[in-house]
Amino acid sequence: ISLGLVGSEMCIRDRDEKERAEHLMLVDLSRNDLSRVCRPGTVEVTQFMELEAFSHILHLVSHVEGRMRDDVDALDVLRAAFPAGTLSGAPKPRALQLLDEWEPTERGPYGGVVGYFDLAGNMDMAINIRSATLHRGQAHVQAGAGIVADSDPDAETAETVTKATAPLRSVLTAGELGQA
């Protein structure tokens, strides 16, 4: 299953055209990624643009599923699906180049995957977002928003702040508990 997530509560409330177009692009990216490792005709969207509530944010969620070809394994699926288009943009190779050029710091684990492979050839992966990394006693939290030609900078900034809220609160709470 590949999930396409985009937009915060502020943007989704009206399900504005920009958010729908951005989400559709991400669903198409997921379909394309899975079509490289799935049996022909099996890639389908099983859930489309449904609102789901997370701890501090609402997201539009779509599920894209397909049946794996016999000649591929879990590692092939991982290579096809990641880095996820939800964090890179499109076209993916050029978007990744631009991110390397434009972002002031390396992403580190942010935007990567966390998960496992088992001995039966299965895997379960999640995109590492809404998280904090602790390095040399300092917590690092990263967040972002999808930027497209018709993005509203103020709305994208607000979305980024909203997305960073949960991990920042977790870091602050952990710090308070450590001093208690």
Question: Where would I find each of the regions flagged by the language model?
Answer:
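Extended alpha-helical targeting/anchoring segments
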Residues: 8-9, 13-180
